[in-house]
Amino acid sequence: GSSATAIVAGLIGANAIMDSPLPKEKLLELAIDIEGHPDNVVPSLLGGLCLTARTSSQRWRIIKCDWHDSIKAVVAIPAIRLSTSEARKVMPKNVPISDAVTNMGALTLLLNGLKTGNEELIKEGMFDKLHEPYRWKLIKGGLDVKDAALNAGALGCAISGAGPSILALCKKENGKNVSQA
């Protein structure tokens, strides 16, 4: 995420110095080209929850999603460093198709839950079989943070990106309790 924000900041700064000749769409295209993927540069530039996918014509499709105002995100940032390359090393080269299907289904529940504020859909949608089983062991105390957040009222808790930050989703009224857990 930090490289993406640096790229976006550099592009916005350069564009401003040149009296903003490039529209946001072109800045987005440049940011994706520089970073190599849209995962972090898109929300860094557009803000909010963004979905990205490469289409059959090899162009990036970007969709900004609604996020119900009753749902808040709380992020715990541990005082450890974890490089993306280190986090990628623990990932298997292949995963069972059933795990991939499970994650795709969970994503549909999560997105609908975030849009509608449906707590049960968010809880069910925060289930992951592709990344977290391998990456939690890299974040010392991470599972304790997850348990504390859930016990404090979080609807779900996950590793943010490659880690080590941990994201909890909660109802607005539980945000303070979750953040103090």
Language model regions located:
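Active-site rim beta-loop-alpha module in soluble metabolic enzymes
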Residues: 74-137
